[in-house]
């Protein structure tokens, strides 16, 4: 799970 991806999108 990429928590970072959530912010990036």
From Swiss-Prot:
Which UniProt keywords are given for this protein, alphabetically ordered?
A: Calcium, Heme, Hydrogen peroxide, Iron, Metal-binding, Oxidoreductase, Peroxidase, Secreted
Q: What is its EC number?
A: 1.11.1.7
Localisation per UniProt entry: Secreted
A single GO molecular function term of this UniProt record: metal ion binding
Q: Which reaction does it catalyse?
A: 2 a phenolic donor + H2O2 = 2 a phenolic radical donor + 2 H2O
Question: Per the annotation, how and in what number is the cofactor bound?
Answer: Binds 1 heme b (iron(II)-protoporphyrin IX) group per subunit. Binds 2 calcium ions per subunit.
Q: Which domain of life is it from?
A: Eukaryota
Enzyme type, top EC level: oxidoreductase
Q: What is its main location?
A: secreted
Q: Does the keyword Iron apply?
A: yes
One GO term of the biological process aspect: hydrogen peroxide catabolic process
Provide one Gene Ontology cellular component. extracellular region
The cofactors it requires, by name, are: heme b; Ca(2+)
Signal sequence interval, chain numbering = none
Protein family: Belongs to the peroxidase family. Classical plant (class III) peroxidase subfamily.
**Function of the protein:** Removal of H(2)O(2), oxidation of toxic reductants, biosynthesis and degradation of lignin, suberization, auxin catabolism, response to environmental stresses such as wounding, pathogen attack and oxidative stress. These functions might be dependent on each isozyme/isoform in each plant tissue.
This protein's name:
Peroxidase 4
